[in-house]
Amino acid sequence: MAIDLRPFIPFGRGALSQATDPFRAAVEFTLMPMLITNPHLPDNPIVFANPAFLKLTGYEADEVMGRNCRFLQGHGTDPAHVCAIKSAIAAEKPIDIDIINYKKSGEAFWNRLHISPVHNANGRLQHFVSSQLDVTLELSRLVELEKERKTLSIETARSKDQLDYIVEVANIGFWTREFYSGKMTCSAECRRIYGFTPDEPVHFDTILDLVVLEDRMTVVQKAHQAVTGEPYSIEYRIVTRLGETRWLETRAKALTGENPLVLGIVQDVTERKKAEANKALVSREIAHRFKNSMAMVQSIANQTLRNTYDPEQANRLFSERLRALSQAHDMLLKENWAGATIQQICATALAPFNSTFANRIHMSGPHLLVSDRVTVALSLAFYELATNAVKYGALSNEKGVINITWAIMEDKGEKKFHMRWAESRGPEVMQPARRGFGQRLLHSVLAEELKAKCDVEFAASGLLIDVLAPITPEVFPGMGHNVPEQRIA
C-alpha cells in the first residue's frame, strides 16, 4: 500500500505539501511504479512510494519510507551504474538507466530507472521523482538474441568441429541446405540422428528417402515454403537404414537472396512422443475406469433402492456397499490397477468380518491374478455374501463356517477356473423369494466379466455357490502354465 500522506506534513519536514496534492494523487494511482524522494532531508530519503512500486519490489510501505533508494542495490549491481545515478542527482539532472536491483525476496531484476528532478516555480529543487519498470524479460531476450548472433559468428570464424561439438552436447543436430541444389552440410549429431556416416555426401533427397510415406509430402511442402523466409517447424518420422523408426523435430529458416540458404536444427524426439502416447493412453484408461466405477455405483444404488423400502436402512446399506467398493479400489491402486490376486480380494473384502469370525472363514487356492473389473465385482460379491451369512447363514450361529476355495481344473479338454463359496454347520437355509445383491453380482457382473457359469444351491447344510469360467488373458492377465491343476472336493 502507498504511504498515507494525510494530513500532509509541511515541506520543511520532508513530505509533500497540500499544494502538490493533485500531483501526489496522479503518482499514487498510476500503474507505473513510482517513488518521490526529498533531497532536502539527510540522505535524500523516500517520502512516497505508490502501490505499484510496493507490488513490484515486495516491500511494505513502512519498510521503504525514510530510506535511501540504494537498499534496492545488491552484489550484482554494477558500481558504474550507481556512480552515474549519483552524478545525475548531484547535478540535478534527469537520468535514464537500466540497473540490476533486488526485490525483498532477494530476486534480482533489471530495472529501467528514470529519475527526474522537480523544481518549484522559483527554480529551486523540491523533489526527485523516479519511475521503475521491470525489463528483465526484455533484456533477457536481447541477451538471447546476442548469444544467437555470437553463435552464428563463431560458426563462421571457428572450425566446423567446434560447432559440431556445441550442438552435439545439446543433442541437437545442425544443418544447412542450398535451396535450389538441395546439397546439405550436416553436423556430427545431425548425421547420427539420421544414421549417416561421417563422410558421406548428404542431399535433401537422401533425407527424404528416409521419411515414412505418410509424412513425406508434408516434409516436402515445408521445405519448399522455406524460400519465403518464414521460419517453420515440423515433426515427422523416419526409418533409419537399420530399420529403426524415429520421431524427429526440425526447425528451420531460410536466408533469402539470390541463392537462398536454409539453416536448420533437428532433434530426436522419439522418447517425448512415446511419453505423449503413454499419457494419452493413461488418460483414456482413467476415463474408462471412471466410467466403469460410475456404472458400478449406479448399479449399487439401483439395487439398494429397489429392494429396501426403509430410507434409513437404504442409506446404511448404500454406505456399506460404497465402502466395500472403495476398499476394492484402494487395493487396485496399490497394484497400479493391474488387478489383484483372489487371496488379496478375499482378505480385503472379508476384513470387516475377520475380527469376529476369523476362525470360521477359511480360504485356499493358488496364486491367481484377476483383472481390475473382476477384482471390484468379486470384492462386492464376497462382502455381500458374508453380510448375508451373518444375518441368515453360517455366521448367524456359534459354529457355522465358510470355506472359499478356487483352483484350475480340466473340463472337457479345456483349462477352467473353478471357485466355490460353501457354508456349512449353520442353520438350515431356504431359497429366498428373490436373489440378494451378492448373488445378483455373481450372476450378472461375474457371469459377464468371466464368461462364467454360476450355480447357486440352497442345500440343507448351507449355501453353496460354484463358479466355473474359461481361462482368458483379459480376466487372468499374465497367468503362466505353472499353475497346478486340481479339483475342488
From Swiss-Prot:
Instruction: Mark the residues carrying the PTM S-4a-FMN cysteine.
Output: 69
An example molecular function term from Gene Ontology annotations: ATP binding
Q: What is its EC number?
A: 2.7.13.3
Instruction: Please list the residue ranges annotated as the PAS domain.
Output: 19-93
Q: Which InterPro entries match?
A: PAC, PAS, PAS-assoc_C, PAS-like_dom_sf, PAS_fold_3, Sig_transdc_His_kinase_HWE
Please give one Pfam family short name: HWE_HK
Q: What residue stretches are annotated with the PAC domain?
A: 93-147, 232-281
**Reaction catalysis annotation:** ATP + protein L-histidine = ADP + protein N-phospho-L-histidine
Q: What class of enzyme is it?
A: transferase
Q: Where is this region: HWE histidine kinase domain?
A: 259-341
Note whether Repeat occurs among the keywords: yes
Positions of modified residues (Phosphohistidine): 288
Q: Which UniProt keywords apply?
A: ATP-binding, Chromophore, Flavoprotein, FMN, Kinase, Nucleotide-binding, Phosphoprotein, Photoreceptor protein, Receptor, Repeat, Sensory transduction, Transferase, Virulence
Tell me how the protein is altered or processed after translation.
FMN binds covalently to cysteine after exposure to blue light and this bond is spontaneously broken in the dark.
What does the function comment of this entry state? Answer: Photosensitive kinase that is involved in increased bacterial virulence upon exposure to light. Once ejected from an infected animal host, sunlight acts as an environmental signal that increases the virulence of the bacterium, preparing it for infection of the next host. This photoreceptor protein is directly related to the bacterium's survival and replication within host macrophages.
Protein name, please? Blue-light-activated histidine kinase
